[in-house]
Amino acid sequence: MLNPIVRKFQYGQHTVTLETGMMARQATAAVMVSMDDTAVFVTVVGQKKAKPGQDFFPLTVNYQERTYAAGRIPGSFFRREGRPSEGETLIARLIDRPIRPLFPEGFVNEVQVIATVVSVNPQVNPDIVAMIGASAALSLSGIPFNGPIGAARVGYINDQYVLNPTQDELKESKLDLVVAGTEAAVLMVESEAELLSEDQMLGAVVFGHEQQQVVIQNINELVKEAGKPRWDWQPEPVNEALNARVAALAEARLSDAYRITDKQERYAQVDVIKSETIATLLAEDENLDENELGEILHAIEKNVVRSRVLAGEPRIDGREKDMIRGLDVRTGVLPRTHGSALFTRGETQALVTATLGTARDAQVLDELMGERTDTFLFHYNFPPYSVGETGMVGSPKRREIGHGRLAKRGVLAVMPDMDKFPYTVRVVSEITESNGSSSMASVCGASLALMDAGVPIKAAVAGIAMGLVKEGDNYVVLSDILGDEDHLGDMDFKVAGSRDGISALQMDIKIEGITKEIMQVALNQAKGARLHILGVMEQAINAPRGDISEFAPRIHTIKINPDKIKDVIGKGGSVIRALTEETGTTIEIEDDGTVKIAATDGEKAKHAIRRIEEITAEIEVGRVYTGKVTRIVDFGAFVAIGGGKEGLVHISQIADKRVEKVTDYLQMGQEVPVKVLEVDRQGRIRLSIKEATEQSQPAAAPEAPAAEQGE
């Protein structure tokens, strides 16, 4: 029989329900988590045995949103969900990052977490719900996992921190921060902010971590009631004798290799040392496991780098702990792009471009939480050549999507409002070289490229990656980390912002025991680094260019009476289509009567504005217009005036004499002066050529063509 076990608790302004034992009973563990009608079903399956020769931990996290959760049918051709969207990929990463460090070292059994959104309240984002669900399911499963974790979203409204703000509240918030951690320590932070101070950001992290303890307590209570027995897993016993033998052969040589400052040269030397050491040991005993030897060598390598940093010795590339690598900053490097920059920091380099488009270039995102339009796009590409490798080139991978999102967050706070700068902006960062923190190089490059494109950003922004090496109470915070320092260190801490404050903060911590004080030191050290980089960037370009590129569309905005929108659009869009073809511009009309005309040529834009003004102008009774004959009928002629509006010139109003035949006086396409006699209630216009010519005397009334008179 189905025997659901349920726990309910209050979490900020929301009620959270954890339920297990009802569904997916063949999975290792399954939990349905709901928070005020947003429900996510999370399952965990772990393999009891590791695959032979497995040398890494194969953890997979899948997050999938079902449109039925919002009471909708997918809009795709096949009417079913397809591959993960960018948003789903980002949330999968958000779940993965805090749980991955909590599996014990040496655990290489396959584990898969699947989170499925099955119901959604548009005010409650499913990401926090999914993170709580993954934590609960892993804790219930019996798989070796040093959790549970809690997760919280923190907003900052009216100088107050807000726990798990609703979507409406987030629109008013200066901060959107997600923090996850265990009972004792923060493990992950992901945030964007409107240039808040270091203290405000740190306060938000501490607030979120304190508030999420209620989640951890309730998951622990659920585990007591419904948890499965802990797996009897033990790490492989350490072969002390083999470790000592490998260290004797390789430690001193690896220590020397890590004094080589050039990355490629260092990697080549390390590879030689490893292969020679393994060859020597296999020659002594062919029964040794090559994978095990590789792991021992990696541990020695890690220890060499860490111990040198903790001893206060220079880093791998010879720098002190708070030194930034050499910077090279150039703008306007590509002639035909709207804005471009090449930003180089040591062996990390980004070629960044900015492209301006119109509102119709904006991306319409049909998300579970509702449809929204994104007018600022940021794409990050990491080709294999950037690290001197060959590999697949194609659609962006999870890492590229995640890094692009982080870089976008770094720049978003300084982007101008649409009413001040009505362009869709796309930034693309091509990583051409990489050795540490290419996402932060993308932030710096984006700031430069946007200024080069003439985008009036509120301030220049720069980003920096910090690292940490900690043993016991001894720790060192490193500025501008290399790839190796990221890989071998205990924390990856990325901060982007302007001179005035932080726009984005991302933190991934691999160990417990990172205190508030350590985070404070890292944030303050990052501020110094950020200000140094901004100083160098300002030497290349210190303000947005006064004008946009000659190759970018210029958007001119005019306002018309909303009642006249139908006249500009025309039947089935005929008028606006003809206008865009005639003027060579792009025209967009909003419901409030705002008309945006985009053109690369100023004269074309002026022509389009003039034509729209003609179409929307009120026809004045008694005024004389120049019109064009569009139709000739027995009882008169129709003449187009004022932007395509047609009026009738009755046969009696063509000349001051009796007209027997209209074609004796008028031809199709002929331009004639006409006076407006009347506009009736239905908008029909009566015109007169006779009165217009009388008014403009000494000009005579139109004469019949000479040939016809002579007949």
Swiss-Prot record:
Belongs to the polyribonucleotide nucleotidyltransferase family. One of its GO terms (molecular function) is 3'-5'-RNA exonuclease activity. Mg(2+) binds at D486, D492. Component of the RNA degradosome, which is a multiprotein complex involved in RNA processing and mRNA degradation. Involved in mRNA degradation. Catalyzes the phosphorolysis of single-stranded polyribonucleotides processively in the 3'- to 5'-direction. The keyword Magnesium applies. Residues 553-612 form the KH domain. One of its GO terms (biological process) is mRNA catabolic process. It holds the Pfam family RNase_PH_C. Its cofactor is Mg(2+). One of its GO terms (cellular component) is cytosol. It is found in: Cytoplasm. Keywords: Cytoplasm, Magnesium, Metal-binding, Nucleotidyltransferase, RNA-binding, Transferase. Its EC number is 2.7.7.8. SUPFAM superfamilies: Eukaryotic type KH-domain (KH-domain type I), Nucleic acid-binding proteins, Polynucleotide phosphorylase/guanosine pentaphosphate synthase (PNPase/GPSI), domain 3, Ribonuclease PH domain 2-like, Ribosomal protein S5 domain 2-like. Residues 689-711 are annotated as: Disordered. This is Polyribonucleotide nucleotidyltransferase. PROSITE patterns: KH_TYPE_1 (PS50084), S1 (PS50126).
